[in-house]
A protein has these predicted regions:
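Compositionally biased, intrinsically disordered low-complexity segments
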Residues: 33-35, 55-58, 86, 93
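Short, charged, intrinsically disordered terminal tails
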Residues: 2-13, 79-94
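N-terminal acidic leader/helix
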Residues: 7-40
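Short, flexible helical or helix-coil boundary motifs
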Residues: 1, 26, 30, 73-76, ...
Length: 94
């Protein structure tokens, strides 16, 4: 599979500079999908340490979730914090 050129990727990525920086500076991973009992979520982690965990709203698009993930990764990196919407939501549902 051919990768897009940097020029094409920059225009197609929607400005995901913090997601790019996360990949460039860590050996981390980003997962989008189910984190039971949460049907739709996004998780950015390095090893077993979550940096950002977001719950996708019922009407939120994947593009909107990725944009929120990008902003949250920027904040987490700048402030050296963990942003976790998932654990409070799991506790709320118990």
């Amino acid at each position: 599979m051919n990768k897009p050129s940097s020029k094409n990727a920059a225009s197609a990525d929607g400005g995901f500079e913090h997601i790019q920086a996360f990949f460039d500076t860590t050996r981390g991973q980003i997962t989008i999908g189910e984190i039971p009992p949460i049907r739709r979520a996004a998780l950015a982690a390095v090893g077993k340490k979550a940096r950002v965990a977001l719950v996708c709203g019922e009407t939120e698009s994947v593009a909107d979730l990725l944009q929120r993930l990008n902003v949250a990764l920027g904040k987490a990196a700048a402030e050296d914090i963990v942003i976790d919407e998932v654990l409070p939501e799991i506790k709320r549902r118990r």
